[in-house]
């Protein structure tokens, strides 16, 4: 997955519009963002995740179809979805009757980029999450590093 292009701090402010319906809750149950919004699906770990894949959430048919087809969330699709959920679903599924359950729209592209960056700042990237067990073994070395991201950045350049 590519690094988000938005401003996470600005996205935190824009997320105030989203928290009426959505929350970001870590796997351990810690609420990272949002209040009591349960109308919309949880948004933790969205990058690289299949649409409609959070358990115990009543998704619409169109978004479930995308998840079943093997699609995964990325920044470009997120931007299109939040700009117009129904249009996105019709385009992606090819079903002219597809309808998004999310009625709110965020057509401002900069704000959408910022929200994506904010959501990504709250959850590990898919590659980082998969590498977590190996990272535990290297914990003593990581403790000596100036910044946790430096080893990954150096490794990515090779």
From Swiss-Prot:
Keywords: Electron transport, Heme, Iron, Metal-binding, Periplasm, Photosynthesis, Pyrrolidone carboxylic acid, Transport. GO terms for biological process: photosynthesis. The keyword Iron applies. The keyword Ribonucleoprotein does not apply. One of its GO terms (molecular function) is metal ion binding. Belongs to the cytochrome c family. Transmembrane segments: none annotated. It is found in: Periplasm. Binds 1 heme c group covalently per subunit. Its main location: periplasm. Cytochrome c2 is found mainly in purple, non-sulfur, photosynthetic bacteria where it functions as the electron donor to the oxidized bacteriochlorophyll in the photophosphorylation pathway. However, it may also have a role in the respiratory chain and is found in some non-photosynthetic bacteria. This is Cytochrome c2. GO terms for cellular component: periplasmic space. Residues 129-158 are annotated as: Disordered. The modification Pyrrolidone carboxylic acid is found at residue 1. Heme c binds at residues 18, 21-22, 102.
């Amino acid at each position: 997955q590519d690094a988000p292009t938005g401003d996470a701090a600005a996205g935190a402010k824009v997320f105030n519009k989203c928290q009426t319906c959505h929350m970001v809750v870590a796997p351990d149950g810690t609420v990272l963002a949002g209040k009591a919004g349960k109308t919309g699906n949880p948004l933790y770990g969205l990058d690289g995740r299949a649409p409609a894949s959070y358990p115990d959430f009543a998704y619409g048919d169109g978004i479930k179809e995308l998840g079943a087809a093997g699609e995964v969330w990325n920044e470009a699709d997120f931007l299109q979805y939040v700009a117009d959920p129904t249009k996105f679903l019709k385009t992606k599924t090819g079903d002219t009757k597809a309808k998004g359950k999310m009625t709110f729209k965020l057509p401002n592209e900069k704000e959408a980029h910022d929200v994506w960056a904010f959501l990504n700042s709250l959850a590990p990237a898919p590659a980082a999450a998969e590498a977590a067990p190996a990272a535990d073994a290297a914990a003593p070395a990581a403790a000596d590093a100036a910044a946790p991201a430096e080893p990954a950045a150096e490794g990515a350049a090779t």
